[in-house]
UniProtKB/Swiss-Prot annotation:
This is N-glycosidase Npun_R5314. Belongs to the YbiA family. Coiled coil: none annotated. It comes from Nostoc punctiforme (strain ATCC 29133 / PCC 73102). Its EC number is 3.2.2.-. One of its GO terms (molecular function) is hydrolase activity, hydrolyzing N-glycosyl compounds. Gene3D superfamilies: YbiA-like (1.10.357.40).
Length: 156
């Protein structure tokens, strides 16, 4: 069975980067994974001044809009680092919040797919043939957490 997720209020909405599960990374608290991810686009770029605005955005939708502005210059290595940045944030989210960690682990070995009708990089896109990098990230994080819990069980 494939598990599709997209909107926060739908089943498995906690898998969305817009879910209200804050994270601490590099001594900074971020309200959502989306806030963190969008801000990281500008680290070291000439438009780095936008980072505090993204951080302070009232909603993940606002953070996304600020980060997606096409007139701003992204960091030079963005295409090389964006999937690792996403993975770091998603892992932190599920290590921080036990309730949603349990939801993720209970998906077993099911295929996780971000059912985005517009994003064929992070999701499956309108034609369902997208790259689904967010789903793949979640499945990788699920496996890493399983391994961590297994090691913890051995040494308790």
């Amino acid at each position: 069975m494939t598990i599709y997720f997209y909107k926060v209020w739908q089943p498995y909405g906690c898998f969305s980067n817009f879910s209200p599960h804050g994270i601490h990374i590099q001594d900074t608290y971020w309200a959502t994974v989306e806030h963190y991810y969008q801000a990281q686009k500008f680290v070291g770029s000439k438009d780095a001044a936008i980072i505090p605005l993204i951080h302070a955005a009232a909603t993940p939708e606002e953070a996304a809009a600020l980060g997606r502005c096409s007139t701003r210059q992204l960091r030079r290595d963005w295409d090389l680092v964006k999937t690792q940045i996403m993975r770091e944030a998603v892992l932190k989210k599920f290590l921080t919040h036990a309730d949603i960690r349990e939801v993720l682990l209970k998906t077993g070995d099911e295929l996780l797919v971000e059912n985005s009708p517009t994003d064929s990089f992070w999701g499956c896109g309108a034609n369902k043939a997208g790259l689904n990098h967010l789903g793949k990230t979640l499945m990788s994080v699920r496996e890493e957490i399983r391994n961590l819990l297994s090691l913890t069980g051995i040494y308790e």
